[in-house]
Amino acid sequence: MRKLKYNTTRVILMIAFISLSACSSEDAMIEEEQVIPDPDPVAQTDEDTGPVVDCTNQGTNPTRDTDIPNPRNIGDIDDRSCYANYSESSILGKFWGIYNITDGSNHMDAPNTLQPRIERSLSRSQATGAGSYARFRGVLRILEVGDTGTFSSSGSYFMQAKGKHTGGGGSPDPAICLYRAHPVYGDDGNGNQVQVSFDIWREQINFRGGSGSAGRTEVFLKNVLKNEQIDIELEVGFRDDPNNPGQTLHYADAKIGGEEFNWNIPEPERGIESGIRYGAYRVKGGRAQFRWANTSYTKDEVN
């Protein structure tokens, strides 16, 4: 009888232990499944929100070719801004080259002459035969551009086609067309007007060496959102003229966010090379901030 009571007690204790373990495991699973959201998630950003000044001690580079070791952005740097030097960030799944310039920050050239810039120059295609080209690709984010309140002096360039020509006229290293971002303002939710998107314009020459209002024309291309990742492609080169056998066209074809914006350069017979620069250039009021990632470059030369 005593043995039966002992066995019965033992069975009851085992059942109780198993039930308690099962409940504990179920509670643990419920606790693991509970996800507590972050009440104040912080968005990834590499935007400069500090004060806008001409120069900083850290940004005052001694030479135009000041660069970081092994930059991820391709091309030879031309840094003519004492506000900030080229640097890089790692956000949004990419490594980004940071290009920040401010009004009045060109410490390399004579005062009140050339505009601030941090650009990268790519080796030029020096041939003019059909099939010669220079092609640049990258991903761009625009965070801020210069603004004076007047269209002609507002906006900042993020890319340009370059190329010398015969017969003289204009700069010794003339731009062919420049891609300019203009600010579009909207409410930030707190009653402040801030730059929320950007109109992209192509500033193109009317003739070789053209500059100023008489020598260039602005053509609206499209609008992009602030901080939007935009696939960019620019190809500058020579191709056969379908309407004039034996002659070639000099062209600058851009693709911005999947949309094509092709353009034939005036006086193609005078062109002798095709080149590209990108980064940040021109700010006549405030600050400009561009970010570049996944940059690549190819060229071909056909005589």
From Swiss-Prot:
Domain of life of the organism encoding this protein: Bacteria
Annotated compartments: Cell membrane
Alphabetic keyword roster: Cell membrane, Disulfide bond, Lipoprotein, Lyase, Membrane, Metal-binding, Palmitate, Signal
Main location: membrane
The keyword Metal-binding is assigned to this record: yes
SS bond partners: 55-82
Lipid-attached positions, N-palmitoyl cysteine: 23
EC number: 4.2.2.-
First and last residue of the signal peptide: 1-22
Topology term for the membrane: Lipid-anchor
One annotated Gene Ontology cellular component of this protein: plasma membrane
Effect of residue 162 to M: Abolishes catalytic activity
Residues at which Ca(2+) binds: 59, 61, 79, 81, 84-85
Lipid attachment locations (S-diacylglycerol cysteine): 23
One of the record's GO molecular function terms: metal ion binding
Names of required cofactors: Ca(2+)
Active-site residues per Swiss-Prot or TrEMBL entry: 162, 281
Function: Ulvan lyase involved in ulvan degradation. Ulvan is the main polysaccharide component of the Ulvales (green seaweed) cell wall. It is composed of disaccharide building blocks comprising 3-sulfated rhamnose (Rha3S) linked to D-glucuronic acid (GlcA), L-iduronic acid (IduA), or D-xylose (Xyl). Ulvan lyase catalyzes the endolytic cleavage of the glycosidic bond between Rha3S and the uronic acids GlcA or IduA, producing oligosaccharides that have unsaturated 4-deoxy-L-threo-hex-4-enopyranosiduronic acid (deltaUA) at the non-reducing end.
Protein name, entry field: Ulvan lyase NLR48
